From Swiss-Prot:
PTM sites of type Alanine amide: A26
Function statement: Shows antibacterial activity against S.uberis.
Annotated protein name in UniProt: Maculatin-3.1
Natural source organism: Ranoidea genimaculata (Brown-spotted tree frog)
GO CC field: extracellular region
Location(s), subcellular: Secreted
Length: 26
């Protein structure tokens, strides 16, 4: 459903943000 799609997109954005942050800190 729509909520599942939104949840998956939020999770992928979160992991992307974490990757960017760790890239900045490295």
């Amino acid at each position: 459903g729509l909520l599942q799609t939104i949840k998956e997109k939020l999770e992928s954005l979160e992991s992307l943000a974490k990757g960017i942050v760790s890239g900045i800190q490295a």
